[in-house]
UniProtKB/Swiss-Prot annotation:
UniProt source species: Prochlorococcus marinus subsp. pastoris (strain CCMP1986 / NIES-2087 / MED4)
Keyword Metal-binding: yes
Protein name listed in UniProt: Ferrochelatase
One Gene Ontology term from the biological process aspect of the record: heme biosynthetic process
EC top class, as a word: lyase
PROSITE patterns linked to this entry: FERROCHELATASE (PS00534)
Gene name per UniProt: hemH
């Protein structure tokens, strides 16, 4: 029987406090996360940002137990999926490829080659495609495949996005309905989707389909939820986790929470729509930061829907995705990593970065000047930022 390797791709996360700095460095070294007009500055800037943000990020991870649970949860998902697929009669072994922390993609490739898999199904644990999530992981996998003649011999099929998959939608509906059932007035409970944001330029200039897929997904979930419950609930979609001075997708989660409080919303059902497992954005950002904002705004009942993790219906859905991928038309790594025609992702491809095209030159100059000032101050150990207590 053909031996199939199912490669689950995910973000990764620091497992210990000491991992936070290196994890952030890996994250910001990715040109699909931060784009610079001068590629040579990518790694120095990644070092600078990770150095500046480490302490704050470490405090966030301490508030959820000292590390990210993303590896543990992804390993549980992999085991459950492997078991489900073997129950279907498939000779499947699951592997994990994290983008920014262990186990890295290189490790998964080595394991698959050592195990002698005959075919690979690549399944990103991101329901919605984005340049900075699935796109980055696909492109990293393609780069490694292109440089490995032995790896190239193994046939590969990819799942690009799967936000409309029935098992995924059903599992979301089941978890949302659990929280709605706890409300005194289930019909009026407000469904609050919060998705991880991306810079607005990703969508408007780079052609990232992420925003459209998130919006379509929220409508599909609401439609299925109405069929399941027999009534319609009001809902809102927002975007969280923005960083830096550039404009991200709107509306911002923290601002919408304040508006909903002013609108006298009592029962809020918070749905982390772009996350399939618990991690820092759900456990700390939503459960602590956003809950505090909501309570200050006057929202009485803040109920957060659990992440999918190993919810049985979700695992069933993932298994159906793998089977469909094996039986359906082939989407190879070249097609999966393909970006919209108008995307110009890297600095050498001259995609303008910043707030708008006309500000490209000045944004680049200002960024480089700020970078050099910060770099000199970090090396010298003195300067205005030290006097202000920032460094």
């Amino acid at each position: 029987m053909e031996k199939v390797g199912v490669l689950l791709m995910n973000l990764g996360g620091p497992e210990r406090i000491t991992d936070v700095g290196p994890f952030l460095y890996n994250l910001f070294s990715d040109p699909e996360i931060i784009r610079l007009p001068v590629p040579a500055f990518q790694k120095p800037l990644a070092w600078l940002i990770s150095t500046l943000r480490s302490t704050t990020s470490q405090q966030a991870y301490l508030s959820i137990g000292g590390g990210s649970p993303i590896r543990r949860i992804t390993e549980q998902q992999a085991r459950e999926l492997q078991s489900k697929l073997r129950d279907k009669g498939l000779n499947v072994t699951t592997y994990i490829a994290m983008r920014y922390w262990h186990p890295f993609t290189e490790s998964a490739i080595a394991d698959m080659k050592a195990d002698g898999v005959d075919q690979i199904v690549v399944l990103p644990l991101y329901p919605h495609f984005s340049i900075s999530t699935s796109g980055s992981s696909f492109r990293e996998l393609k780069k490694l495949r292109d440089s490995d003649s032995e790896f190239q011999k193994i046939p590969m099929r990819c799942v690009r996005s799967w936000f409309s998959q029935s098992g995924y939608l059903k599992s979301m509906v089941e978890l949302i309905s659990e929280q709605i059932s706890l409300c005194e007035s289930p019909d009026s409970a407000h469904i609050f989707f919060t998705a991880h944001g991306v810079p607005k330029s990703y969508v408007e200039e780079a052609g990232d389909p992420y925003k459209e897929q998130i919006e379509d997904c929220s409508l599909l979930i609401i439609d299925e939820l109405e069929k399941y419950l027999g009534h319609t609930n009001p809902y809102t979609l927002s975007y969280q986790s923005r960083v830096g001075p550039v404009e991200w997708l709107k509306p911002y989660t923290e601002e919408v929470l304040t508006d909903l409080g002013k609108a006298k919303v009592n029962d809020l059902i918070v749905v982390p729509i772009s996350f399939v497992g618990e991690h820092i954005e759900t456990l700390q950002e939503i459960d602590i930061e956003y809950k505090e904002i909501a309570e200050k705004a006057g929202i009485v009942n803040f109920r957060r829907v659990k992440a999918l993790n190993t919810h049985p219906t979700f695992i069933d859905g993932l298994s159906e995705l793998v089977v469909s991928c094996l039986e359906g038309p082939i989407i190879n790594i070249e097609k999966a990593s393909e970006l919209p025609e108008k995307v110009k992702l890297y600095p050498q491809e001259k995609w303008q970065w910043g707030w708008n095209n006309s500000s490209e030159v000045w944004n680049g100059r200002v960024a480089m000047i700020v970078f050099l000032i910060l770099f000199i101050e970090l090396i010298s150990g003195s300067g205005p930022l030290h006097k202000l207590g920032i460094l």
